[in-house]
Regions:
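N-terminal Lys/Arg-rich, disordered targeting/topogenic segments
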Residues: 1-12, 436-458
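Membrane-helix interfacial "entry" motifs
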Residues: 10-14, 120, 405, 409
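Coil-to-alpha-helix initiation sites in intrinsically disordered, low-complexity, charged segments
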Residues: 10-14, 88, 393-401, 449
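Sec-dependent N-terminal signal peptides
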Residues: 14-27, 418
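C-terminal segment of classical bacterial N-terminal signal peptides
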Residues: 29-38
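Active-site-adjacent loops and short helices of periplasmic peptidoglycan-processing enzymes
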Residues: 37-186, 190-204
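Domain-terminus/edge residues, biased toward the C-terminal soluble/receptor-binding domains
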Residues: 165-166, 180-182, 186-187, 192-442, ...
């Protein structure tokens, strides 16, 4: 038989080409479906000197640059100022106060132009200092909180020390440049977390605008939030997911932007320090970089279920049951979700540690009893915890229970305290028997020897 070497008709050739094309498309589709998705790199931050991006729920650092380098704090000082003022003045919001020239003496920079003798409410002053970023208002609330600006600065440094902000020193409540004043992004994240937990501070620092009503010396004053991520006055920077905190600049410290992005169930703290200043009309790099980083985090991080309720983590022996093979499944009592990279291999890159409340499991146990904690670590840091429970009941053996109580008594303090008391009580008897040794000496010796003999035989 000879092979058919006749050329294919054009219709047949088209059919072959279509078949091959469909086959190649199928291979490419399947390959794409099986390829792992890798997280993209964080956006470059060459125009800002210091960056820290932190997930607040899990205290997980998403991105950092020079986060432990001491820098001039610039306007970020107002986060500490605002928090302490909100704590101190929360019950006085409707109180009317009078500004004195002494309160604002020597204050320069961004100003609401508060006048000597002007009366306005504590609420107005807090909004002006925190939302508007006005230095003269910050000085007045410092005086209202602690009696003087100097005393308030002492309170700021005491709070920083209490919180463990070891690289931070304040010399004023405004952020105006002073070579003696410094902080780090890591330190700043500590006070920012505290401020995020203060409802009044977050309410004020998240306001887009505020109007100070007309006073005895001024017409009504409307201002926007100093932080352009919060204020929608500039669509170049506005981020509808951002809440609160602070922004501003000094020539020496550069631009600082601090905010919290609340999106998809996560709260991410973004800190930018030493941002470059630019000419009027150009985009401010600190704002641009903050938005880029927050968008990057939203694309590449999310909440992952790393433990499921009832999932057996280990099977451990249960003591005091009287049954040598009594074992209990140890399980988390609740699901645990942790904010992690979306491409993370949960099984391969997380470390799970079981920490039991006691050295081991001991009956009696009831299903659902908490017996310890499972901690989950990522890159050496604990990022989540869940309580551990057992799934069934275990009764204690009566004989082993009594034996355990007796052992506990022997090992207890009361037993050892009783020994010297018993010895003291025995002394009179020993003295009495010793004084009669001459009369009954032979009998006593014989009795002792007999006892020893019996002991040897037994």
């Amino acid at each position: 038989m000879t092979a058919d070497t006749r050329p294919l008709h054009s219709g047949s050739r088209r059919l072959v080409r279509r078949t091959l094309l469909l086959f190649l498309c199928l291979i490419l589709t399947l390959s794409a479906a099986t390829l792992p998705a890798y997280a993209e790199d964080a956006p470059a931050s060459s125009d800002v000197g210091v960056v820290l991006l932190l997930n607040l729920e899990n205290n997980l650092v998403l991105y950092e640059k020079e986060a432990d380098t001491p820098v001039y704090p610039s306007s970020s000082v107002k986060i500490m100022m605002g928090l302490l003022a909100c704590r101190s003045l929360a019950t006085r919001l409707n109180e009317t106060v009078t500004v004195s020239s002494a309160m604002v003496a020597g204050i320069t920079g961004r100003s609401l132009h508060l006048a000597d003798g002007e009366t306005l409410t504590v609420r107005d002053l807090l909004y002006a200092a925190i939302c508007g970023g006005y230095n003269d208002a910050a000085a007045v609330v410092a005086c209202l909180s602690s009696g003087s600006v100097a005393a308030f600065v002492e309170d700021m440094n005491e709070e920083a020390a209490r919180l463990g902000m070891t690289h931070t020193n304040y010399t004023n409540p405004t952020g105006l440049h002073d070579p003696a004043m410094s902080t780090t992004a890591r330190d700043l994240s500590i006070i920012a977390r505290e401020a995020y937990g203060n409802e009044l501070y977050m309410l004020i620092s998240s306001a887009r605008t505020y109007t100070v009503p007309a006073t005895n010396v001024s017409e009504a004053r409307l201002f926007t939030n100093r932080n352009s991520l919060i204020s929608d006055s500039s669509q170049n920077y506005y981020n509808g997911y951002c809440a609160g905190m602070n922004a501003g600049m000094t020539d020496e410290g550069g631009w600082c932007v601090v905010t919290v992005c609340e999106r998809n169930g996560a709260s991410n703290l973004c800190i930018i320090l030493r941002g470059l200043d630019v000419a009027s009309g150009e985009l401010i790099p600190a704002y641009v970089q903050a938005n880029r980083l927050l968008s990057w985090a939203n694309r590449n991080y999310g909440y992952r279920t790393v433990l499921s309720a009832g999932e057996t983590l280990d099977t451990l022996r249960v003591g005091m049951t009287g049954i040598s093979k009594s074992k209990a499944d140890v399980v988390p009592s609740e699901d645990l979700k942790i904010y992690l990279p979306t491409d993370l291999d949960v099984e391969g890159q997380l470390v799970y540690d079981l920490v039991l409340d006691d050295e081991g499991l001991t009956a009696p146990l009831t299903a659902g009893d908490n017996v310890g904690t499972v901690t989950v670590s990522y890159h050496g840091s604990i990022v989540g915890k869940a309580p551990l429970t057992v799934t069934e009941d275990f009764k204690r053996n009566g004989f082993l229970n009594a034996l355990g109580l007796f052992k506990g008594y022997l090992m207890g303090r009361s037993f050892w305290l009783a020994i010297p008391i018993f010895a003291i009580m025995l002394l009179p008897y020993l003295y009495a028997t010793g004084s009669s040794r001459g009369r009954y000496g032979l009998r006593t010796v014989q009795r002792r020897k007999r006892i020893r003999y019996i002991k040897r035989h037994f």
